């Protein structure tokens, strides 16, 4: 499947109930529905995958390469700050990606300020809430020449 893959890491399945003061009240399903509608307007296939397991995210990145996915939008959650393996999978497959964070990681605990992915990403969006996903999709559509 050519198109865009949206990957979400650990605990993002809890959006809507997890620390709403930080992450808001939108569920992951709410976010995916908006992205699906936006991609449909642009005629761009889009797929979604969430896992709490690092290895499952890595396998999905490998599959994205085999499927010739045009772009990945990834919110790696806490794996942002810990996963060399996730970084290596993105480097090995060379699928371009945009890193997204709902909260402003730079305004939080010091350990959240380092990302193993930011320096190899096409772009990084953080601190704009769930709207960050929509902005990432707009950017991905422009980068793949399928703007809304």
UniProtKB/Swiss-Prot annotation:
Alphabetical UniProt keywords: Amino-acid biosynthesis, Aromatic amino acid biosynthesis, Lyase
Record-annotated active site: 23 (proton acceptor), 101 (proton donor)
Record GO biological process: amino acid biosynthetic process; aromatic amino acid family biosynthetic process; chorismate biosynthetic process; quinate catabolic process
Pfam families associated with the record: DHquinase_II (PF01220)
Domain of life assignment: Bacteria
Key word Amino-acid biosynthesis present: yes
Family membership: Belongs to the type-II 3-dehydroquinase family.
Name under which the protein is recorded: 3-dehydroquinate dehydratase
Organism: Methylococcus capsulatus (strain ATCC 33009 / NCIMB 11132 / Bath)
Designated gene of the protein: aroQ
